[in-house]
Amino acid sequence: MNDQQPFSVTASPTTEKTSAFSLTIRPDNIGVISIDVPGERVNTLKSEFAEQILSVFELARQHATLRGLIFISAKPDSFIAGADITMLNKCSSAEQAENLAKQGQETFDQIAALPFPVVAAIHGACLGGGLELALACDYRVCSLDEKTVLGLPEVQLGLLPGSGGTQRLPRLIGLDSALDLILTGRHLRAGQALRQGLVDEAVPHDILLDTAVEILKKGKRKAVPLGWRSRLLNSPGIRHLLFKMVKRKTRAKTHGNYPATEKIIQVVRRGIEKGREEGYRHEARAFGKLVMTPESAALRHLFFATNALKKTSGAASEAKPIHRVGILGGGLMGGGIASVTATRGQLPVRIKDINEQGINHALKYNWQLLTKRVQSKRMKPTERQRLMTLISGSTDYRGFEHADIVIEAVFEDLALKRQMITEIEDHAAPHTIFASNTSSLPIHQIAEGARRPQLVVGLHYFSPVDKMPLVEVIPHAHTSAETVATTVALARKQGKTAIVVGDSAGFYVNRILAPYINEAAYCLLEGEPIESIDYALVRFGFPVGPLALLDEVGIDVATKIVPVLSEELGDRFTSPPAFDAILKDGRKGRKNGKGFYRYNKTRRFWHSGKEVDSSVYPLLDVTPKAHIDPALISQRAVMMMLNEAARCLDEGVIQCARDGDIGAVFGIGFPPFLGGPFHYMDRLGMETVVKTLLVLQQQYGDRFAPCERLLTMREGQRTFYPPADKDNSIS
């Protein structure tokens, strides 16, 4: 064999097309392993790949003068996005899942044990098992491309890194930094990864391979003495304090609802204190146990559900291209919509407001958001400037003739929204879609009188727009399928998860939220303290309690939705009459510093910035005293939400249980570890759900009467998802 000529061999003993790994030996005797999973858009690791990787190593060893190996992806924007999660659904026991982890550990140990240097040349997503593979290499170099991210997100699936990640990462970047990355599952961009020591170099994509070659020439990585910081953290006393602090902080955030976080801390500690081999054993065992937990099953269900949703347009039509976007209103919502359109969608945005102040507000808001990214080194100042040039404004309709879609974000006033349609039909192109960002007004009423009703659609964003991931797309009876598909496509370009919902009062998210908040209000009127109610629901798994949420949304905004809901859907949506006193007292929530809580403008490190406003109690004529079991508080509020979600499915407000689960989790923070209302009801069982509602109905009234859908499902012993392989059946 001529060592000076490049040649290619494949990892598979069959054909190149069946192998995800192929080996090319360069003239300089450096081997390049290309990763390219056949027929897949991104690279993911599968159990059968262990044999393929080992075959590559065997072929490499046959080349006597080989200087080293470089792993690189043949996919455009994906190094390795993680393991193929469907493998876990095939595991019927913890032992089977544990064996998968052991296989990964053994395979990556083979990489670390190779007698020559190995480099991971990373471009695109390097996540989960992909990063664990890279950690087993001697060196890591990544591209500076914005699509390059590194992380161990397994905790977001209720798992821990099972192929050595819990053992290798702390030894590479330090115990505290590793715990932070593994426990949060957050992603690092190239610059962050370089600063943390996760990669050795971060370079432009076009010199990635050349840089990997130069690094490889250094030879096998030699052991480097620990720095003073690592030595300090590894001292028994400091280490004990660190683990104690991390455990306390983690439990305060998770309230014990996520078993993976406890296991992560235990496994990392075991490896640090008892050695790597012992750490591996505990890592694999913990991984196997976590795979079988209901929490992981629920989180994997959401993973599959969101992936399935991305593959649908929401309508039986193709989306038309969107080149320019118009926005009516430069307030908080309008400014937020402009931000995600320009920053994530990379689309030119034209804002119209009745005065310059509104436009200036939107521009200032976007500048502040981008400046935060510049200050955190996630964006260069030149990129901030470029994105700001995409946003312009005017007090008239100049430029709107070029808009393909106009998003209205004005006050919740029916006459005003109808006027906006008329003006857009006068000034915009005949093909321009009119999307109303309304939280309560029926779209068919807004579209009444429109000359082109087929182009009118609802597009409900949640506040704050730059942070909340969900949007509801609401067609009315005359909205065209193309309009729906195009609106969904725009929402996805903006980085949103979009569900298509029916045009009825409250749509889906606000409709299931209202009875949940109402029940919290009834608990308050029974004398339960505000903080007790909120804490009960936070412990259950919601990010904030219902009364704190009311303050955040705005008490005035929330109460405007109530008449719309109660008029169309009945008395169960009527808020307690005593609550009128809260509005009359001028309480709007955080926006005016006065709601169920008092908000201090100046925060101190010993103070959260808000405290219960006890002057609420006399307004409601109650004396606060904690007397309701927290489990009963959460049961009452959550059961109201579950019952309403089932009604929404029965009435066609949502198209399927999958959309209902996604809407609740991403729209209002329904506990992800429960998988959404429908997944949770399946887990409880229809018998338990109906029985609980009947008991609550007997105690608290007919608002708890189980809906017809639940009664029918109990009768037929049915579930919302197919019992077999439920986590992968989300249609």
From Swiss-Prot:
InterPro entries: 3-OHacyl-CoA_DH_CS, 3-OHacyl-CoA_DH_NAD-bd, 3HC_DH_C, 6-PGluconate_DH-like_C_sf, ClpP/crotonase-like_dom_sf, Enoyl-CoA_hyd/isom_CS, Enoyl-CoA_hydra/iso, FA_oxidation_alpha_subunit. The keyword NAD applies. GO terms for cellular component: cytoplasm. It is found in: Cytoplasm. SUPFAM superfamilies: 6-phosphogluconate dehydrogenase C-terminal domain-like, ClpP/crotonase, NAD(P)-binding Rossmann-fold domains. Its EC number is 4.2.1.17, 5.1.2.3, 1.1.1.35. Residues 320-729 are annotated as: 3-hydroxyacyl-CoA dehydrogenase. It comes from the Bacteria. The record marks 132, 154 as: Important for catalytic activity. Residues 15-204 are annotated as: Enoyl-CoA hydratase. Keywords: Cytoplasm, Fatty acid metabolism, Isomerase, Lipid degradation, Lipid metabolism, Lyase, Multifunctional enzyme, NAD, Oxidoreductase. One of its GO terms (molecular function) is enoyl-CoA hydratase activity. Catalyzes the formation of a hydroxyacyl-CoA by addition of water on enoyl-CoA. Also exhibits 3-hydroxyacyl-CoA epimerase and 3-hydroxyacyl-CoA dehydrogenase activities. In the N-terminal section; belongs to the enoyl-CoA hydratase/isomerase family. Heterotetramer of two alpha chains (FadJ) and two beta chains (FadI). This is Fatty acid oxidation complex subunit alpha. It comes from Pectobacterium atrosepticum (strain SCRI 1043 / ATCC BAA-672).
